[in-house]
Structures are given as structure tokens and as C-alpha cells.
A protein has these predicted regions:
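Extracellular N-terminal segment of 7TM GPCRs
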Residues: 1-26, 38
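Juxtamembrane membrane-interface segments at transmembrane-helix boundaries in membrane proteins
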Residues: 1-11, 72-85, 154-171, 207-210, ...
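Helix-to-loop junction signature of class
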Residues: 14-17, 27, 31, 54-70, ...
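Class A GPCR helix-loop hinge within the 7TM core
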Residues: 90-125
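Loop architecture of class A 7-transmembrane GPCRs
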Residues: 119, 136-180
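Intracellular effector-coupling site of seven-transmembrane GPCRs
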Residues: 191-232
């Protein structure tokens, strides 16, 4: 595939993500209106809405860059911000997915009560801590990231930093950690599914516990299809960087796929979304 072919592919992907991602954020916001208690799940969903919304604000700049086929005219630092936001979106979303699944696993283990935040302050502190850790670690990266990129008219070409051994090690470690965390979560999910199946036998499909576990499987599937392929290919990309020009474009496509996590609630709560639209009407949510 030529360079223009990859640009067209990225353009189509980002337009699709922007349109349906925006729809997803609107529907998620509407669904939260019906939840009164400040549960751990609701806090995670609120954070996911914020993560998706901030990322979606940067997508028009990517779309314009790939659609116009012209030079980047907004400066290198803004290019860095737009470039880093897709990475921040990926890792923040992954953290909140993992947090949400862990809470649901704990709730399943101790079925006596549902975990809730009893004070808004506690939820705010917990959420702010995660945001500060991610963006605090990315602030110095924003300053030093892309110093080897001398052409300010081209954006999203910062791969030369991978020539540094420390950057390679950091990438290997991050990719391994993400895949490892997902694998551990998947292991516990299989355990809980087997436990529910063994406990209820033939009546498993009629039990609420089983369908609750299937919802967890949906989140795990979103994490797997959106994040794991990129992390797996990233290991290969880092080790083979610079050998072919095509590998950079393939990496960008895998990176774009991570943004499909913006559709999480449409997939997770499809039936509830349909009920919401039918009962309240589309414009009541706007």
C-alpha cells in the first residue's frame, strides 16, 4: 500500500470514530441521569465519558490533516498534544476498564452488598489521582517528545525516539504490562464463569449472575480488540523500527483501532440504549 492509501484508511477510521464516538458519549451521559447512587461503576463511567470527550475534541485536527493532504500548520507543540492524546485516551480508558472489572469481581466475590462511594469527595480524589498520574507522567514527555523531528510541517512522525535504548525499554515494559494485566483479568473472568456454571448447573443461563459475568466479558472483549493488538504489534514495531517505511503506517492504523473503545457503551448497553431512546426520545437527551 502507498502512503496515500494509508492516509485514506486513517481518514475513514477517524471520521467513523468521531461520529459514533460522539454518539456514544451522548448516550452514556443520558444513561447516567437515571442512576442516583454514586457507585464505583458510575464513577468509572463518568471518567470514561470525560476520557472519550477530551480525545474526541482532538480528532477533527487529525481528520483535517489527513483529508487536506497539506502540511501541518499548527506548530510542533500542538502536534505533540494531539499525538499524545490518543495515547492518553488509550491508557486512561484501559485503567478505568480494569478498575471497573476489578470492582465487579469484588462485588461478585462478596455478594452481600454493592460497593458505593459514600461521599462525592472520595470519588473525586480517586479519579483525580488517576488523571494526575497519567497526565503528570506525560507532561515531561510532551516537552521532550519529538526532539529528533526537525520538520514542523509533518505531524505524527516521532518514531526516531525509538532509536534510544531507554525509550525502547520503556515501550517494551508498557506493552508487556498492558498485556499482562488483561491476561490476569481474563483469567479471573474465566474462573468466575466456571464458578457460576458449576454453582447453578443447567439453570445458569436463567441466573442474573451469569448475565452480569457476560457484561464483564464485553468489557474484556473491548479491551482485547482495541488495545491488545496495538500493544502486541508495538513490540514488533519497536524492534523493527526504521527497516521499512510501511511499518510506521501499519503502527498508525493499529493506534487508530485503539480509539474504537469510544463505542464501549453502545456495545455494553445496547439493549438499554434502545430502551432509553424509545422511552425518552432522542431529543430529551440533548
Amino acid at each position: 500500500m502507498t502512503n496515500s492509501d494509508f492516509k485514506i484508511a486513517l481518514l475513514v477510521l477517524y471520521i467513523f470514530i468521531f461520529l459514533f464516538g460522539t454518539l456514544n458519549v451522548i448516550l452514556m451521559s443520558c444513561m447516567l441521569q437515571s442512576q442516583r447512587h454514586l457507585s464505583f461503576t458510575k464513577v468509572s463511567v463518568i471518567n470514561l465519558i470525560a476520557v472519550h470527550s477530551i480525545f474526541l475534541l482532538t480528532l477533527p485536527f487529525r481528520i483535517y490533516y489527513y483529508a487536506s493532504n497539506k502540511d501541518w500548520i499548527l506548530g510542533m507543540y500542538f502536534c505533540k498534544i494531539v499525538s499524545l492524546m490518543i495515547h492518553a485516551h488509550m491508557y486512561l480508558a484501559f485503567i478505568f476498564y480494569a478498575f471497573l472489572l476489578i470492582v465487579r469481581y469484588v462485588e461478585h466475590s462478596s455478594q452481600r452488598h454493592k460497593l458505593e462511594f459514600h461521599r462525592i469527595l472520595h470519588a473525586t480524589i480517586a479519579s483525580t489521582t488517576v488523571w494526575l498520574i497519567i497526565f503528570g507522567s506525560m507532561f515531561p514527555v510532551t516537552i521532550y517528545y519529538g526532539k529528533m523531528q526537525n520538520d514542523s510541517t509533518q505531524c505524527f512522525h516521532f518514531g526516531k525516539a525509538l532509536e534510544q535504548p531507554s525509550v525502547k525499554i520503556f515501550n517494551y515494559g508498557t506493552c508487556t504490562l498492558v498485556i499482562l494485566v488483561w491476561s490476569v483479568l481474563a483469567f479471573f473472568q474465566v474462573y468466575f464463569l466456571l464458578y457460576v456454571s458449576k454453582t447453578f448447573g443447567k439453570a445458569t443461563c436463567q441466573r442474573q449472575e451469569f448475565w452480569a459475568q457476560l457484561k464483564n466479558v464485553v468489557f474484556l472483549s473491548v479491551m482485547f480488540f482495541c488495545f491488545v493488538p496495538y500493544q502486541g504489534f508495538r513490540v514488533y514495531y519497536v524492534s523493527e523500527y526504521g527497516k521499512t517505511a510501511e511499518i510506521h503506517h501499519i503502527n498508525e492504523v493499529f493506534l487508530a483501532v485503539t480509539a474504537f473503545s469510544c463505542f464501549d457503551m453502545i456495545v455494553f448497553a445496547g439493549r438499554d440504549v434502545c430502551k432509553l431512546i424509545n422511552s425518552r426520545g432522542w431529543f430529551n437527551c440533548l
